[in-house]
Amino acid sequence: MKDAFSESKIAGIKLRNRIIRSATHEGLADDFGNPTEELIKKYEDLAKGEVGAIITGYAAVMQNGKSPLINMLMIDKDEKIPYYTELVDRVHQYNTPIFLQITHCGRQTFSRTTGMPTVAPSPIKDKLYNEDIPHELTDSEIDEIIKCFVIAIERAKKAGFDGVQLQLSHGYLLSSFLSPHMNKRNDKWGGSTENRFRIVKKIMERAREKVVDYPILAKMNGYEKSKDGIKLEEALIIARNLEKASCDAIEISCGIAEEGFVGIRGEFPFDMIAQHNHLMQKMPKILYPFIKPVLKHSFASPEPRYLYNLDSAIEIKKNIKIPVIVVGGIRKLEDAYNMIQREQCDFIAMSRPFIIEPTIVKKFKENKQQQSKCIDCNYCQIGVEKTPVKCYYGKM
């Protein structure tokens, strides 16, 4: 019988167990987007903690796709390959596979960060990130982005990564192409689900020509809260399209940034938001008492929610044969066991539990602990805008 600690494989890559560290922006790259010694040590700690596999924080494939969050990884130049090789070799010492998540942030960045205009499939301003209306991408610009993704995949392979993960969720560029909420084009890149998927299909086709059977995973939304966003019915189509395009595994997440994701659960850290968020710092403090209830109502769940992507993952797993990874509000070992044993998913992924406890998998396996120590204070999610990720444990 399958369980959370049974060995398994993704595209032939052996995992010691079925618990994966989901991509988490650490904010620990250097000024050029190379991994630093501090970041490598964090990944070593995860590997020592016997995690099944690591998916890195997101790495941008080109300069205009760089995140406004502090010290993002970049995979935009060949000169970066040796830095990543060092990272991979250090992690592989502990027999832990590591996948590089690659992305383009699209409209979820600032021109002052990238030094270039922000871009998107459609000229629709992001409510949280973008101070300007993004430039609508032309055919030639889309083709250049496709090329950059493919080259990034080649670089990841040369660096020794066990595979890559395409970031198709959370409102970044590829996510915004997939979502009818953000993609209002009426050409071959917009309209139908097939057209909105076209950019991903082209990346996969061209990547397969270059790297053949090199593992390519994807992270996608099972749903979006926006009325005209992706819903489960369309997510099923996207998942099937990914499988047809020779994707090797799919991680199920949800939401986009301007919806507040569903990440703010439980405590609403308004003081932290006021201190770190770029929009709040532009507002007079006298307005804070009026702003707080509006933000809390719009972006936060009134109480912690757990396993909030499981229903989507269950339905998607019924429709495809490639492995399904579920992330989102997983805190208890019992839940991880149940999801795997009931074959509701093939792997489970976590982020915040690894921020507070990099060795949580080992503790679970040795029966020293049954639940993450994460208290869902949400400070880590807010603080990462200006400082490297860490656990605040409810204290600023």
Q: Which role fits each region the language model picked out?
A:
Residues 1-396:
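Flavin-dependent oxidoreductase catalytic cores
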